[in-house]
């Protein structure tokens, strides 16, 4: 190809870093499509969502996939500093800089986070961060300007600021993740750390007006999973208003269900994943009543009822 990337068509079993898929998997896969495209080392399945304009940044974003197995190699300090600086350059609502990220290097804390997330690879991630809402720093700054954070005058503890700070933390994490992918590193976002928010707050010694948002593990990839299928754009992008015809939005759902069902997740490499509709139905019935936000945020000083 003219851009120097490689394009390879395979009609044999698709090799994973963990081995070769079974004949049954191969027959299931090959019946739906006849080749796999290897572009810049990233495996992609055919789909209708084509990017007709491209550059290195777009390629990094289109190749985004969660990496859950890393090589036992440290990330050098210059790369780490660059990733942290990139995160700082993400958008920040009203320039409040109301997030922080805690880098976890203590093996005991890593092990605890792996326990919270029920994911052993967290304990061995070369780079591990927990991004948090941080109005604690701003509360101290406001206090120096004569504002009592405990008073009603201090508005950074209310729901609007909480959600804006949460957004800022996610934007910073995504900037770091994208930069890491552009450098050939792999990442996985760790929402599973929120399985035990009180425990996470305790082990990270999070002060008042802080709250955990997400974790991010980074390292040199030791696996090469296929990029997950994406929903057809017409199901997710609308013009001017939300479509009145809800059923029309779902016209392409059967085809998307089939495409998702053909995908193999390395975590369960012996079977295809469930169709998207089935996943939605299953998750919609999961009881998450124990994951209440108001009381946990209130314990950190936030007042989300206002």
Language model features with spans:
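Short, low-complexity, intrinsically disordered N-terminal modules
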Residues: 3-6, 11, 20, 31
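Charged/polar low-complexity intrinsically disordered segments
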Residues: 11-16, 36
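Cationic, low-complexity basic patches in intrinsically disordered or flexible, solvent-exposed regions
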Residues: 9, 17, 26
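Intrinsically disordered, low-complexity segments enriched in serine/proline and basic residues
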Residues: 4, 15-16, 43
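N-terminal cationic leader/targeting segments used for protein routing and processing
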Residues: 15-17, 22, 50-51
